[in-house]
């Protein structure tokens, strides 16, 4: 007989068409993945990157979804997964000398953050 995996409740939030490249957003997401909600907010507040503002907004939305839709306690939430995918690129042109034009690519990305309740000590003992 096979064991059925225990389903954990997850709340997810997306931020679409955020101005900024996906690689620069991933640099920040890699540092907060697996951390608690409170620790992630503190880290995001003091990081010197421009992408921390939209990431904070998406993280707060995911926690609000967990609290409102699933009735979870925000103090027990952990960032289970966070990723950023490339969005459409807006192409613009910058005029240069002698009638030339340099192309400017304005990157966008889609940010997704998933939060779930941290496993408590009693749950860990039951699973073992």
Swiss-Prot record:
One of its GO terms (cellular component) is cytosolic large ribosomal subunit. Keywords: Ribonucleoprotein, Ribosomal protein, RNA-binding, rRNA-binding. GO terms for biological process: translation. Transmembrane segments: none annotated. PROSITE patterns: RIBOSOMAL_L22 (PS00464). Pfam families: Ribosomal_L22 (PF00237). PANTHER family: CHLOROPLAST 50S RIBOSOMAL PROTEIN L22-RELATED (PTHR13501), LARGE RIBOSOMAL SUBUNIT PROTEIN UL22M (PTHR13501:SF8). NCBIfam families: rplV_bact. Belongs to the universal ribosomal protein uL22 family. This is Large ribosomal subunit protein uL22. It comes from Prochlorococcus marinus (strain AS9601). The lineage of its organism: Bacteria, Bacillati, Cyanobacteriota, Cyanophyceae, Synechococcales.
């Amino acid at each position: 007989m096979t064991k059925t995996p225990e389903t954990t409740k997850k709340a997810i939030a997306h931020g679409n068409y955020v101005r900024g490249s996906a690689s620069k957003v991933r640099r920040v997401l890699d540092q907060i993945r697996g951390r608690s909600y409170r620790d992630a907010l503190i880290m995001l507040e003091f990081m010197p990157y421009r992408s921390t503002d939209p990431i904070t907004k998406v993280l707060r939305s995911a926690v609000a979804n967990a609290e409102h839709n699933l009735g979870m306690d925000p103090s027990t939430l952990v960032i289970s997964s966070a990723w950023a995918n490339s969005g459409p690129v807006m192409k613009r042109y910058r005029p240069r000398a002698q009638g030339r034009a340099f192309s400017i690519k304005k990157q966008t990305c889609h940010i997704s953050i998933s939060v779930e309740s941290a496993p408590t000590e009693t749950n860990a003992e039951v699973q073992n």
